[in-house]
Amino acid sequence: MPQLDTSTWFTIIMAMLPTLYLITQLKLLSMNYYQPPLTKNPNLQTHNTCWRPKWTKTYLPHSQPQQS
């Protein structure tokens, strides 16, 4: 049975590593990552609504104690 010639394996592996690294970097560069939303200046958006100038809250009535 003939012996397996492994004399070129080191050269092939050492050439493969930078190639895989380069391919991975190019793949990562082409990906679109999520961009966080930009902070908006609240002074830029002004709407003329009737509830904008006043502060209103709606309260529920207090619950009555249970009668037993």
From Swiss-Prot:
Q: Which residues carry this modification: N6-acetyllysine?
A: K54, K57
UniProt keyword Magnesium present: no
A Pfam family of this chain: ATP-synt_8
- Record's subcellular location: Mitochondrion membrane
N6-succinyllysine PTM positions read K54
Membrane topology term: Single-pass membrane protein
GO terms classed as biological process: proton motive force-driven ATP synthesis
Q: Which GO terms describe its cellular component?
A: mitochondrial membrane; proton-transporting ATP synthase complex
MF annotations from Gene Ontology:
proton transmembrane transporter activity
> Which InterPro entries does the record associate with it?
ATP8_mammal, ATP8_metazoa
**UniProt entry tagged with the keyword GTP-binding:** no
- The membrane spanning regions, by residue number, are 8-24
> Which family would the database say this protein is a member of?
Belongs to the ATPase protein 8 family.
Assembly and oligomerization = Component of the ATP synthase complex composed at least of ATP5F1A/subunit alpha, ATP5F1B/subunit beta, ATP5MC1/subunit c (homooctomer), MT-ATP6/subunit a, MT-ATP8/subunit 8, ATP5ME/subunit e, ATP5MF/subunit f, ATP5MG/subunit g, ATP5MK/subunit k, ATP5MJ/subunit j, ATP5F1C/subunit gamma, ATP5F1D/subunit delta, ATP5F1E/subunit epsilon, ATP5PF/subunit F6, ATP5PB/subunit b, ATP5PD/subunit d, ATP5PO/subunit OSCP.
The entry's function note states: Subunit 8, of the mitochondrial membrane ATP synthase complex (F(1)F(0) ATP synthase or Complex V) that produces ATP from ADP in the presence of a proton gradient across the membrane which is generated by electron transport complexes of the respiratory chain. ATP synthase complex consist of a soluble F(1) head domain - the catalytic core - and a membrane F(1) domain - the membrane proton channel. These two domains are linked by a central stalk rotating inside the F(1) region and a stationary peripheral stalk.
Q: What PANTHER family does the record tag this protein with?
A: ATP SYNTHASE PROTEIN 8 (PTHR13722:SF0)
- The name this protein carries in UniProt is ATP synthase F(0) complex subunit 8
- Protein species of origin: Papio hamadryas
